Swiss-Prot record:
Low complexity: bias regions: 149-163
Region (Disordered): 146-192
Family assignment from sequence similarity: Belongs to the Alfin family.
The protein's name: PHD finger protein ALFIN-LIKE 3
Recorded GO MF terms: histone binding; transcription cis-regulatory region binding; zinc ion binding
Gene: AL3
Comp. bias (Acidic residues): 179-192
One GO cellular component, as annotated: nucleus
Site feature Histone H3K4me3 binding, where: 210, 214, 219
Domain notes: The PHD-type zinc finger mediates the binding to H3K4me3.
UniProt KW Transcription keyword: yes
CDD domains for the chain: PHD_AL_plant
Provenance organism: Arabidopsis thaliana
GO biological process: chromatin organization; regulation of DNA-templated transcription
Amino acid sequence: MEGGAALYNPRTVEEVFKDFKGRRTAIVKALTTDVQEFYQQCDPEKENLCLYGLPNEEWEVNLPAEEVPPELPEPALGINFARDGLSEKEWLSLVAIHSDAWLLSVSFYFGSRFSFHKEERKRLFNMINDVPTIFEVVTGMAKAKDKSSAANQNGNKSKSNSKVRTSEGKSSKTKQPKEEDEEIDEDDEDDHGETLCGACGDSDGADEFWICCDLCEKWFHGKCVKITPARAEHIKQYKCPSCSNKRARA
C-alpha cells in the first residue's frame, strides 16, 4: 500500500493542501459515517492493519507497505489490536490522533520532497491549522469550539435561532441553501457560517443543504450523510450514522 502516491504527486502548496483535505475527509468518513464498516474491518485476529486515507476521499484498512522504507510515510500500524481492549470512543479517538499525525507527516514529506521554502511551509501549515483536526471532529471538540465561538460573538442568543422554519411554519432541523431560502435572517446566516459538519468537519458549504441529528444535535452536510431535502421532509426524527450505529450495538 502506498497511501495513494500512485495517483499523483502534489508539487505546490495548494496541491499538497488539496491532497491533505482529500485524505482527511476520507479518514473522517471512516471514523464517523462509515464507522460500523470500519469497526468490522479492524478485526484484532488479523495481522497488523493500517487506516489509509486516499486523496480521492476514499479510505481503506490494509496491511502496511512491503517496501522498506516506503515511498510515503506510513500510518499507525496495528490499529486493530487495540480495538477490543478499549471502549469504542477511546479507540476511535486513538486512531484519530495517529491519523492526524500521519496526515501532517505526508504533507510535509511532499514539502521536503519538492523543496518548499520557509514561507511556503509556513503557509501550508497555516492552511492545515485552519481546519479542525480529525480528533476534534471525532470527539466533538470541533463542535464545542464552534459553539463557544458563536456564543462569544452572539452573546446569549438562543440555540433555537439556528433552526430555520419550513414554509408550513413548523420547526425543521434543516438548513436550506442561501438561494433557496432567502428569508433566513442575517444572524442565522452567521450561525450557518460557524457550523462545522459532524462528518467532514468543514464549516464551508453555506450554499448547501444541512441536517441536524435529533440525538447528538450535530449538523451535517446533506451530501455527507446522503440525505436530500426531499427525503428530509419525510423524516420525523433524524439520527446520524454514528448515533444509529451506537443504538444498533446497544
